[in-house]
């Protein structure tokens, strides 16, 4: 090694309490730019410490049979620790940010990654971060849409890729009550449609968000385009609404 390389390696080894071999390897990654290498080292060590703390948080709620999984009972305990009732819509927000694959289930790696993304390392910090996100959720349309889209696979039963319409209605009432002016008409339509006995297609679920935005500026659906790319079920709803809902609301 060149003299300057030797001195850099020696200095880095001393500063980071690592072997000369490890110091040399790390410096090489950053072309022997000491400041960059040291900054990256500190960042990595900070992340490793944060991951360790969050793994400990996860372990408080993990299953005895599978330490990398939080199941329903553990999820109840987690929500309780976060001061969130199981009936609260906030459970969906927590599930979204902690990357739950389905209701009442969290996986260690995804949980830790999600908590890190919230800049938290402890349960108390996580509780505060969630409270802050709840406030954002109430007014941030992009976050509202993201959680809405995320909820469809979250609410599906394990091993299933589709959501029953009856269950979908329950989530519509939670997620769209303040954003979809025709929610009551939509639910009334679903209950008399053959779809009530079937699964609601995912694309219909997703497109309903955009439709809810559309009707805010066109509550009578006067400019609705039946030749557009809307799902068939929404076409059928608009026809139903013009015959039943709009007629009733204008009388």
From Swiss-Prot:
It comes from the Eukaryota. GO terms for molecular function: cullin family protein binding; ubiquitin conjugating enzyme binding; ubiquitin-like protein binding. Residues 5-42 form the UBA-like domain. GO terms for biological process: protein neddylation. Keywords: Ubl conjugation pathway. InterPro entries: DCN-prot, DCN1-like_PONY, PONY_dom. One of its GO terms (cellular component) is nucleus. Residues 49-242 form the DCUN1 domain. The keyword Ligase does not apply. The keyword Cell cycle does not apply. It holds the Pfam family Cullin_binding. May contribute to neddylation of cullin components of SCF-type E3 ubiquitin ligase complexes. Neddylation of cullins play an essential role in the regulation of SCF-type complexes activity. This is Defective in cullin neddylation protein 1.
């Amino acid at each position: 090694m060149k003299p300057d390389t030797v001195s850099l390696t020696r200095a880095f080894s001393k500063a980071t309490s690592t072997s000369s071999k490890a110091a040399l390897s790390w410096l090489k990654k950053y072309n022997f730019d000491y400041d960059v290498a040291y900054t990256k080292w500190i960042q990595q060590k900070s992340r490793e410490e944060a991951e360790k703390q969050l793994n400990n948080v996860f372990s408080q709620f993990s299953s005895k049979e599978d330490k990398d999984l939080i199941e329903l009972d553990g999820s109840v305990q987690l929500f309780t620790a976060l001061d969130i009732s199981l009936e609260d819509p906030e459970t969906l927000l927590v599930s979204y940010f902690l990357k739950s694959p389905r209701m009442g289930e969290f996986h260690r790696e995804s949980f830790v990654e999600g908590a890190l993304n919230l800049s938290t390392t402890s349960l108390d910090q996580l509780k505060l971060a969630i409270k802050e996100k709840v406030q954002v959720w109430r007014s941030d349309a992009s976050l509202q849409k993201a959680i809405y889209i995320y909820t469809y696979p979250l609410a599906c039963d394990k091993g299933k890729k589709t959501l029953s319409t009856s269950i979908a209605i329950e989530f519509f009432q939670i997620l769209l009550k303040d954003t979809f002016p025709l929610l009551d008409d939509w639910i009334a339509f679903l209950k008399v449609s053959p779809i009530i006995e079937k699964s609601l297609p995912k694309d219909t679920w997703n497109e309903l968000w955009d439709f809810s935005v559309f009707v805010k500026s066109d509550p009578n659906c006067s400019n609705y385009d039946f030749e557009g790319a809307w799902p068939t079920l929404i076409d059928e709803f608009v026809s139903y609404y013009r015959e039943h809902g709009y007629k009733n609301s204008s009388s």
